[in-house]
């Protein structure tokens, strides 16, 4: 019987554990599986941790979640095909839930089986090499400070790529008298009440961190973009300007000549694909893009078909795309899907990369990733889900944000699994200061 190592028990790792569980429940024999998770619990990025910097064992804290974080996309677009929100909560819930609600949903799907028994918690993978047709993995039991090793036939890397921040350098940083932090360490917008906040970036983190700071009472929020502005109709107290030139004392000076008082600078400058636990020959090297190179179907490592990566793309689709990738990866491991020739693999990768390079706007990007996810869905037995409806929802969501960036979370969408329409939340997002699950689910 073959052995499979999975690194990471966040959403991607849980997806492939779930995929194997589906086969096992149908009476099929599955490989021996060991999942290594360096945190003390499962859920990955969705675990909130007050810590920043290092954990109690000296490892970097992987968590980037913060208080008052609400989903910035419709929950219907990430719904699991085999476990609906209606099933989990026993009723329809609003389309934009806070973090705790989504975490409860993610873990609810995997808590009922024996998936947890396959996970080694508080376990850090130190290094991995491929030798004699096996993956040799050295790992540390962090609680008992023991180093152990094991060998595996297949390796699935499901660590995500939103835990190692990219931190650029700007003139004047070393002498800036205020605070400089990456969004990875952002934990509570209340901390910046009455402050002049500079947010550097132009993607989802910058958008949400800036809105959070405004919502919870920042004196001003100035967003500095590098290439293209987000271009939303920002509420009072917020503005978007072109690219930070330098910090001069407590002033931020931008390329367009704007000068702004600054108490804190928050770097929403993205993350690195970082795999220090892999031998150099096994590492995926890419920036954040919709179709990383050298991955067949976005999953199988071109140079070694026993190495599989999950969730390494820039993302519109998330949980159900991870599931489609996981079902595909499972079937490759189980030899239910035969790998084509090297030439065919190369041709397929180049086709997707070439299409990605021609994308010009969010609608095209949504179409691209929807078609990619549908292709994976069609070649596995992942349960039925309406990806055309999800495509439509994503485009409506983008339109709602353009209409009003402050109120788009107050909209409702229909489930691609059950068809039920989400109710309107009892409190508009811009006025909802309590993000607890209890308050969200129960009308006051």
Curated annotation (Swiss-Prot):
Outcome recorded upon mutating residue 170 to A: Retains 5% of wild-type activity with DMS as substrate
Catalytic EC class: oxidoreductase
Catalytic activity: trimethylamine + NADPH + O2 = trimethylamine N-oxide + NADP(+) + H2O
Effect upon mutating residue 318 to A: Retains 5% of wild-type activity with DMS as substrate
SUPFAM superfamilies: FAD/NAD(P)-binding domain
Superkingdom, taxonomy of origin: Bacteria
Residues binding NADP(+): 70, 72, 170, 202-203, 205, 226-227, 288, 409
The name this protein goes by in its record: Trimethylamine monooxygenase
Source species: Pelagibacter sp. (strain HTCC7211)
